[in-house]
Amino acid sequence: KLGLGAMELEFVRSINITKEKAPEIKKVAEESNIILTCHAPYFINLNSLEKEKIKASIDRILNSARIANLCGAYSVCFHSGFYMGQDPKKVYDTIKNNMKVITSTLKKENNSIWIRPETTGKETQFGNVDEILQLSQELHNVMPCVDFAHFHARTNGKYNSYEEFAGILEKIEKKLGRKGLDEMHIHITGIAYGPKGEKNHLNLEESDLNYKELLKALKDFNVKGVAISESPNIEDDALLMRNIYRGLE
């Protein structure tokens, strides 16, 4: 009824859709012309020091991808893990190898949903833009989930100008080609942050995120794909951004 064109299935606490219910959701989404994405559970750490937690993390991503695919979803995003005080290069290799298990399993199952590690909001979390883009270059069916508020929070207030937003988009195109901008999964929200990064999400008008300049950059680069509002007032900010975007020349 709001006229919005996308929705994210939130599996952040648990995968709350059964495989029996999924086809019904797919049918409704198709009839309503809505693109679905999915956010896998928060309880994921592909760099855990405990093998059981790594296995559980892999299973959570796989099961999210399976249900999301049955729902007809476009992509599944997730927070990959934590550095755990280790060398980032070592962490990268560990997470990459565990993601290979995910991508090879889904390939065997003929599940072609996009697997999307997300840019994260804290320095302790794996997932700066270079790490996510490198994973996307090196792994089958992997593309970034680009959370612009997380860039802003992770750097304690940087990445908040047209030039900086454009720089991110230029980097994506340089690393992934035009496809990187044509197949985007984006999160936008207001955000509270401090020296350690993200604290919590805010409504856009209550935050300092320069979202109008971000929307202008997305328009100028002719970005395509899906943009998801993660503000507390999800629909209000989604409509706000849509209306501003449509008004851009």
Briefly describe each language-model feature range.
Residues 7-9, 36-40, 76-78, 115-117, ...:
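Hydrophobic faces of well-ordered beta-strands that scaffold small-molecule active sites
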Residues 22-26, 61, 65, 96-103, ...:
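Generic structural signal for well-ordered alpha-helices
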Residues 30, 47-146:
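Active-site acidic/histidine proton-transfer and metal-coordination neighborhood
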